[in-house]
Amino acid sequence: MKSVRYLIGLFAFIACYYLLPISTRLLWQPDETRYAEISREMLASGDWIVPHLLGLRYFEKPIAGYWINSIGQWLFGANNFGVRAGVIFATLLTAALVTWFTLRLWRDKRLALLATVIYLSLFIVYAIGTYAVLDPFIAFWLVAGMCSFWLAMQAQTWKGKSAGFLLLGITCGMGVMTKGFLALAVPVLSVLPWVATQKRWKDLFIYGWLAVISCVLTVLPWGLAIAQREPNFWHYFFWVEHIQRFALDDAQHRAPFWYYVPVIIAGSLPWLGLLPGALYTGWKNRKHSATVYLLSWTIMPLLFFSVAKGKLPTYILSCFASLAMLMAHYALLAAKNNPLALRINGWINIAFGVTGIIATFVVSPWGPMNTPVWQTFESYKVFCAWSIFSLWAFFGWYTLTNVEKTWPFAALCPLGLALLVGFSIPDRVMEGKHPQFFVEMTQESLQPSRYILTDSVGVAAGLAWSLQRDDIIMYRQTGELKYGLNYPDAKGRFVSGDEFANWLNQHRQEGIITLVLSVDRDEDINSLAIPPADAIDRQERLVLIQYRPK
C-alpha cells in the first residue's frame, strides 16, 4: 500500500512540475523559438534529412534532436507544450534511468525513488528539462550510455557483455546525431578512472569494438544521406561547431576555468546542503566500485568542460544524474546517523526564499529602485514572485520540523517556481524575449504583410513560428544564419541597411512591408536610418514599422 502511495505522489509531482504549468510559459528567444521553428519547418516540408531555419540551411547541430522536437509538435500541435514535449519526455526518461541504475547499485526501492525525485527537482535539471533546447536529449543519451557500459561490465556472460557494448554504441551514435562528437568524448572520459581503478582493461579492449561498430552503423544512414544532399555539412559541423566552439581562442561562450563552480552551487538547489557530504562520502568510499563509477561520472565531464574554452551551464547536465544518486545515498545515511547536513539544507532553502522575497521587494514598484523591474499595473506578477520564494522558504522550514523524516519535502521548494514563474515574468522582459507576446499585440498588422524583415534571428524564428511562415528576411544582421545565407539559393533573404531604401522602392507595390527592429529601451526610433514609415508601433524593445503600397 505504501508503494502505491509513493507512486501516486511521484506522478502528482511530475504533473505539477513537468506537465500542468508548461503551456503557461511563452517561448523564449533565441533558443526556444529557433528549435520550435526548425521542427515546424521539418514537419511542413517533410525534409527529415537536412535541417532548415527560415528556409535556410542550418548546420549548427545534427538531426536527431529536431526529429524528437518535430514528433512533439506533431503529437501535441504547434503550441508551447508541443514545442517542449520532447525535452520533457527526454528528462523523464533520464529520471527513469536514474531509478533503474540506483536500484541496480543498491537494491533499495526507497533510495531509487528519492534519487529520482532529487534529480527531477534539481534547479538546473528543471530549468533545462522544461526548456526547448537539445541538451536534455544529449543528457539522456549520455546517461543511457553510462548505464549501458555498467550493464556490460557487470555481465557474467559474453552475450551479456556484447549486448551491453552494442547498446552503448547505439546511445553514443544517437548522441552524435543529437549534438555531435562530444557524445563520444564524454562517456570515454567518464569511465576511464573506473576502468583503471578496477583493472577492467581486458573487457574494454575485447568488447569495445562492438560499441564502435554499433555507433558507426547508427550514424551511417543519416550521415551518408546528408553528405549526399549537402557535401559541406560534415566539414562545417566538425571544424566550426566543434573545434572553433570549444578549443580555439575565438571559441563561443568563452568563460574562465572556475565557471562551473557557481553553476553547480545554484544548480544543486534545493539540495545544496547535501552536495559537500555526497562528494566527500563518495570519495571516502572510493573502494566501492559503484561509488567510484558515480564519482567519475560526475567529476570527469566537469573537468573536461572546465578546460574547454567555450562553456555553457547546459553542457554539464548529465553530471547531475550521478550526483542525484550520490546525494540520495548520502541523505539516507545522514538521516540515520547525523542529520546535520539535512538541517543545513533546510536553512539554505529558508535563506534562499527569504533573500528572494527581499530582492523581489527591492525591484518591485514599491521598492527603492528608480526603474523597477515590474510596473505598478503588474502588481499581481510581484505577488506571484513573492509566492514563489515564500513557498521555497516554507518548505525549507517544514523540512526542519522533523528533519529525519521530513527532509525529502525539500523537493517541493521549487513548486511555486514551477507553477507561477510563467505568470511572474515582467512585461519589459516579455516584450524583448517573448516574440509571441509581440505577435499577440501586433497580430492585425503582421498578418497581412507581404514581406517581414527583422534584425534578430531569435525574433525572426519567433515570428516565423507564430505566423506559420518561413520567409522572414534578415535585415542588417545575419547572426547564426550567416552560413546558410552564403548559398546562391538564399539570395534575397538578407537586406543590408544601405540597401534597404532601394529594396523598399522595388518591392513596395507588391504589398505591405513590415520591419521589426530590436531597439534599446531609451533609443529614439525617430533617429533610425530608415525611410519615413506609414505606421510605427513600439512595444518597448521591439518596434513594428510598416510601409504600405503607394
Swiss-Prot record:
Keywords: Cell inner membrane, Cell membrane, Glycosyltransferase, Lipid A biosynthesis, Lipid biosynthesis, Lipid metabolism, Lipopolysaccharide biosynthesis, Membrane, Transferase, Transmembrane, Transmembrane helix. Pathway: Lipopolysaccharide metabolism; 4-amino-4-deoxy-beta-L-arabinose-lipid A biosynthesis. This is Undecaprenyl phosphate-alpha-4-amino-4-deoxy-L-arabinose arabinosyl transferase. Induction: Induced by BasR. HAMAP family: ArnT_transfer (MF_01165). Its EC number is 2.4.2.43. The keyword Membrane applies. One of its GO terms (biological process) is lipid A biosynthetic process. InterPro entries: ArnT_tfrase (IPR022839), Glyco_trans_39/83 (IPR003342), LipidA_mod_glycosyltrf_83 (IPR050297). The chain crosses the membrane at residues 7-27, 81-101, 110-131, 137-154, 165-185, 204-224, 255-275, 288-308, 315-335, 346-366, 383-403, 406-426. It holds the Pfam family PMT.
